[in-house]
Amino acid sequence: MAPPPPSAANVSQPVIDSLSAPPPADTVTQPLAVVSEKLPWRHTFISLKVPNFRIFAIGHFIAVIAIWMQRIAQDWMVLQLSGSVTAVGITVALQFMPSLFLGPWGGMIADRFAKRKILIICQSAAAVLAALLAVLSLSQRVEVWHVYVIALALGFVTVLDQPARQVFVNELVGPKYLRNAISVNSTTFQLGGLIGPALAGVLLTALGAGWAFAANAVACCSTVAMLLILRKDQLHLSQPTPRKKGMLREGLNYALSKPTIYWPWLMAGFVAVFAMSLPVLLAAFADHVYDAGAGGYGLLNAMVALGALAGAVASTRRRQLRLRSVVTSAGLYGLMLCVSSLMPTMVWFSVTMVLAGFWCLMFLTAANQMVQTSSNMSIRGRVMSLYLVVLIGGQAIGGPMMGWLAEHLGPHLAVLISGGVPAIAAVVVAVVLARKSSLHIKVDLRDRRRVLRIVQEPQTV
């Protein structure tokens, strides 16, 4: 049973930009209802009631398990072949670098063509690349440069895949269940991230990296099959945007005119560059600090995924989506990374990784939801591609940088910097937003449930 429609008493409407001249109709964001009441627990994953989205989520879950297996196996194989954490960072950078330079064009293509067809082509290409890496590894002919080339090729696939995948969720469920579907997608991603590293650790120890790559090739094929069986008549298809001059500039101007888009972009930039290269740092901790081997590396990644899974589920229960949610989550993620740098043993380090994973996902889902619900379908592909340029491109910069810091300054100081910069940025942004909105913290010792509250100062006439 679907949740009741929100009443006027508990729905807030975003502010629509007021300009001296009316903007084009396709770039005006219509008011989007934001439900402020807490939904019953039975509606936590209500978007799965949509048959097409349920099929997509199952395929996504299988694919995520396999891609996590490939990521762990790929990073560990590069570390073993080269003996260098920096080489692992370069691999990450090559996989993300195309999105940094070509991401906006990927978003423009997502706005102009059918998202489902784009995803089918991209997943087919990913299957071929994974199969090639599996053959090289199983034949024991793989070299570091092979991994570099395949990682770069996969990066070009990601340029088209990611913006189309982000916008396709809306075509599966429609605007009614969009926020919930984004959270469910994050939940399946993190659940797969919990299972994938654990399976990767077993495969690396028992059979070798090649079988992890082979599993990902099969999973990509299964994703293609599930995309093909989706019912077209149940898709919420949007009209393709006709080609015209200045489409990329239009998307950028649109995003920069909306605080609910550009502030999440800014925080995503700090988090992506400094705090999204955890696999690089975890490889350094597993190999150089705790001497835990491939199994320990998989375990640390699984701990992050466990916390992220909890964060993804918690994000489905979020009553309201505000800028303060985005900034606070980013700040707490950075703080948890700082705390982890002080942990004396692998057990305590693993505990802080669970907390870091939780707040990382609370931030990522909040930022994603806010950017998507603040933009119209006709321009959303370009807006999301620019957001992904910041998020993925930041990782391309941060991967080698954090690898270099871990090698030359040590893993502990590297993870302290990794968390410290986003935490400081969150504090600065919070102060700026508070001043713009005349907000301050109120202490009320009589209210045990809400001792601290953020309130707006009354405006003087």
Model features per residue range: what roles?
Residues A2-V461:
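Alpha-helical transmembrane-bundle signature of multi-pass membrane transport and export proteins
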